[in-house]
Amino acid sequence: MSTSDHSVAPASFAVSVPDVPDAELEADDLDPDQIVSGDPVVTGKVLWESPDGKQLRGIWQITPGVVTDVEANELFVVVSGRATIEVEGGATLEVGPGSACVLREGDKTTWTVHETLRKAYHISY
């Protein structure tokens, strides 16, 4: 399924997230101001987008390093890798394979990625 025309994805589908080759993931440039340390690289693939663009489902991957972000409403499951996610004014989340996480819109986070992390996500705006 092509990310350039992900709107044609069926409402119900399955994908083996660990088996999607890195070559099928698209570069997602980080704002240099988000990088705290290291040289992290972000890639991903949108598998489905709602017609109004307010919901996305896909795969996201980041290599080791430390980055900051302001989150959307998101549910994700870590497929591989490890990271520590510090939520400003909130919890510190240690995540690894099988971790299911919820982030709220507006959460300010710092991601310390220890091992290249891949997740399957659902985001709503």
What are the functions of these language-model segments?
Residues 62, 70-85:
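Short, conserved beta-strand element in jelly-roll/cupin
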Residues 89-106:
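Short acidic-glycine-tyrosine-enriched beta hairpin
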